[in-house]
């Protein structure tokens, strides 16, 4: 198991017990490492600074005990934000209908980067469906998605604000 997978396996249960969901873990940098943890509240309420501080204290204590990273690092905790990364299969379903940018590991019709309206997953849950203006609908195998994130649009902002009012 690689370090990122080990970190996810270590951190996710702790966040779950606190009422949060792990969105992404990234360890970046060469000489100065930064461990970035992105989390969301399970109850759907927008993350606040206090939520990030609670997660930081809990994860910091956990990592001090388990010590999975041998070098010095900086811990950063954040919410996904409005133009959030799409990292889990359920993200592609939950955010269907909104504009997204995606990058695939393998070229599809000679391209690796795409931008279009997210349609969600196919019935088998294997392919991410996206409508590109010039090319029509395409399907990218979920396993081949290198990166994906929502595009900040007026529609996305309005939907996010509406969700917070409810």
UniProtKB/Swiss-Prot annotation:
Keywords: Cytoplasm, Ribosome biogenesis. This is Ribosome maturation factor RimP. Required for maturation of 30S ribosomal subunits. It holds the Pfam family DUF150_C. One of its GO terms (cellular component) is cytosol. Disulfide bonds: none annotated. The gene is rimP. It comes from Paramagnetospirillum magneticum (strain ATCC 700264 / AMB-1) (Magnetospirillum magneticum). It is found in: Cytoplasm. Signal peptide: none annotated. PANTHER family: RIBOSOME MATURATION FACTOR RIMP. Its main location: cytoplasm.
